[in-house]
Amino acid sequence: MEADDHVSLFRFPFKIPTFRGIRKGGVYLSGALYALGFWIFLDAVLYSRYSNASDVHVTFIDWIPFLCSTLGTLIVNSIEKNRLLQGALSSDGGAFGSGVGDLDSSMAWQARTVLFFGFALLAGGLSGSIVVLIIKFLVKDYNTYPTLGMGVNNVLGNVCILLSCVVLWIAQNVEDEYSYSLTL
């Protein structure tokens, strides 16, 4: 193995840039995407409350996908990324054994399970907003823009939150040359 190679989970055919500002820029972009998604959804809520002339309004049912996406984002981005590969990188390969390797493998599976629930909440939030759009607006033949726009804004807000989570996940996983890994 060459000195340039490093152990990673995925092999990309291109080199990911590793300068200092990419992590900070990714975090800022993620925050901007979340704020945009929140504002798009809040715009639909405020329009429904104060300017809507139709008989369809934003109710708690419309908030559920948004809350699921937000909770999924919090769960996914609160997991320490080094916990996911902990058991696989131990000396025994994460196999069934005794000692520290078994504990590392257990922690890795717990982290993977929580990560799965976080991504399931994100997917449920996005699919829930699409279902609300279809059932509440399209099936009941509310297909004019100001009324249909409330459902479209719900979907767009959830898409922005999902993209925010993905950008933050990538930004947190970018390794820069100035980070040090100290293990005891």
UniProtKB/Swiss-Prot annotation:
UniProt-listed Pfam families: UPF0220
Glycosylation sites: 52
Keywords for the protein's UniProt record, in alphabetical order: Acetylation, Glycoprotein, Membrane, Mitochondrion, Phosphoprotein, Protein transport, Transmembrane, Transmembrane helix, Transport, Vacuole
Keyword Phosphoprotein part of the UniProt annotation: yes
Membrane topology (UniProt): Multi-pass membrane protein
Residues annotated with Phosphoserine modification: 8
Post-translational modification N-acetylmethionine, affected residues: 1
Keyword Phosphoprotein assigned: yes
Transmembrane intervals: 26-46, 56-76, 115-135, 150-170
GO cellular component annotations of the record: endosome; fungal-type vacuole membrane; mitochondrion; Vps55/Vps68 complex
Any Gene Ontology biological process: late endosome to vacuole transport via multivesicular body sorting pathway
Compartments reported by the entry: Vacuole membrane; Mitochondrion
Family: Belongs to the UPF0220 family.
Annotated function: Involved in vacuolar protein sorting.
Extra facts: Present with 1900 molecules/cell in log phase SD medium.
Name of this chain's protein: Vacuolar protein sorting-associated protein 68
Organism: Saccharomyces cerevisiae (strain ATCC 204508 / S288c)
Gene: VPS68
